Structures are given as structure tokens and as C-alpha cells.
């Protein structure tokens, strides 16, 4: 597989993934299930910041479904780590487990360079 930086609207590079619940699928199969697919990369299921993002996606997932959209969330965590912590029904959307970071490499998703790099640009601004 070639590594390629993609932009909004580009055709995504297909890959095979395993969910925390023992299913194997491909991105190509997944995108056929809805009009729009949001491919989201977070790091580890145990990361507090990632947990906040996951909770927000779970709480707002019906809004995605209402627009014929879906989420495929890539986490650099082992399937068992996630399956032991949350059920498939509670999660609501599909997770692609990538403990070796191969998908992060494929899509050139690097780590944050600093703690500040993890924060939203909105942090610290008056609302």
C-alpha cells in the first residue's frame, strides 16, 4: 500500500480492519452502507482526550444517521482493550482497531508534537 496524504473529497485508500468485536471488514465495504463516511483517527481508547471525543460522537451519532452518514473511528488500541470496556451497542459506530499503527502510517497521521498540539484552537478564547 502506498502512503498518501489525502484531502477532503479525495478518494480514500482502501484497507482491511478488525473491529473490537471480532468482525473483519474493508473501508470499501463500509462506505457502501451510507451516503457519507467520516474516517476519524484518534489515538488510544484509554486516552482521556480521546474518551471525550468518543463520548461526543456517541451522543451525537443520531445526527450523522439522520443525514445518511456514518463514522468509522480508527483507534491505535487492541480489540480486547475496547471490547472489555464498552459493548458494541453502547459504542454505536464501528471502530477499526489498529494497534500497530499501520493505518496511521498509510494515511500519514502523525502524533501531536506537544500537549498544546492536542488542544483545540478555541481553547483560551473568550466565548
List PLM regions with ranges:
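Generic structural signal for beta-strand residues in well-ordered domains
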Residues: 5-8, 31-32, 40, 64, ...
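Short active-site neighborhood of thiol/selenol oxidoreductases, capturing the structured segment around
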Residues: 27-57, 70
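N-terminal "domain-start" segment that seeds a small globular fold
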Residues: 1-29, 52
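Thiol/selenol-based redox catalytic cores and closely related redox-interacting motifs
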Residues: 93, 98-125
Amino acid at each position: 500500500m502506498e502512503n498518501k496524504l489525502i484531502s477532503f473529497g479525495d478518494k480514500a485508500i482502501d484497507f482491511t480492519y478488525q473491529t473490537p468485536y471480532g468482525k473483519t471488514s474493508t473501508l470499501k465495504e463500509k462506505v457502501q452502507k451510507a451516503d457519507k463516511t467520516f474516517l476519524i483517527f484518534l489515538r488510544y481508547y484509554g486516552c482521556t482526550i480521546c474518551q471525550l471525543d468518543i463520548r461526543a460522537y456517541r451522543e451525537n451519532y443520531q445526527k450523522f444517521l439522520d443525514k445518511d452518514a456514518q463514522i468509522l473511528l480508527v483507534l491505535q488500541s487492541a480489540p480486547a482493550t475496547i471490547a472489555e470496556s464498552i459493548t458494541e451497542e453502547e459504542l454505536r459506530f464501528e471502530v477499526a482497531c489498529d494497534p500497530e499503527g499501520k493505518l496511521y502510517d498509510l494515511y500519514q497521521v502523525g502524533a501531536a508534537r506537544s500537549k498544546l498540539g492536542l488542544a483545540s484552537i478555541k481553547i483560551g478564547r473568550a466565548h
